[in-house]
A protein has these predicted regions:
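Intrinsically disordered and other compositionally biased segments
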Residues: 6-7, 19, 91, 121
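Bacterial N-terminal signal peptides that target proteins for export
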Residues: 1-10
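Tandem repeat scaffolds
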Residues: 24-169
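C-terminal segment of classical bacterial N-terminal signal peptides
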Residues: 14-24
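Hydrophobic alpha-helical context, especially transmembrane and signal-peptide helices
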Residues: 3-4, 17, 147
Length: 169
């Protein structure tokens, strides 16, 4: 009897041990705040205007159809995240990592993307009117039908013309 109890306890310990030493899981229910870990979370259709998400971990997170108007995502790590139809007018994404992120049909009017890594990001039909892209890394980014009218281009000098759809002209 003692042997079977001891064996059961040993087996339970072996099963539970990996849980004790595994990295902490993202707190998808945690409130917005600097450094929040929302990796792999579904935060679609959320109201987060003026949220402070500086240096947040947002890998593969879905913000589809959410409102992030005037939110601060400076230094955030949002690689492969989804911002489809997200309202991000006036948002700050300075110095953030958004490689492979999808901003299709997002409204980034007047947003600041200074020094952001946007390589391989998608901006299909996005609105980037008056956005500041100074110093942004846009290698292989896709601006198909994106409205770049009045945007400040990556060199920090060129202002895109009113006919800038899909490319800064």
């Amino acid at each position: 009897m003692k042997t079977s109890i001891g064996l059961s306890l040993l087996l339970a310990a072996l099963i539970l041990m990996p849980l004790a030493i595994s990295p902490a899981l993202a707190g998808c229910g945690d409130p917005p705040g600097p450094g929040v870990d929302w990796r792999n979370c579904n935060l679609s259709r959320q109201e987060m205007s003026k949220a402070d998400l500086t240096k947040a971990t947002l890998w593969r997170t879905s913000f589809n159809r959410s409102t992030l108007t005037d939110a601060n995502l400076s230094g955030a790590d949002a690689n492969r995240s989804m911002f489809l139809e997200t309202k991000m007018a006036g948002a700050t994404l300075d110095g953030g990592r958004f490689t492979y992120a999808d901003f299709s049909r997002a409204d980034l009017t007047g947003a600041s993307l200074k020094g952001a890594n946007l390589s391989r990001a998608r901006f299909h039909n996005a609105i980037l009117r008056e956005a500041d892209l100074t110093g942004a890394d846009i290698r292989d980014a896709d601006f198909f039908r994106a409205d770049l009218s009045g945007a400040l281009w990556i060199d920090g000098k060129k202002r895109c013309g009113e006919d800038s759809v899909g490319a800064c002209r």
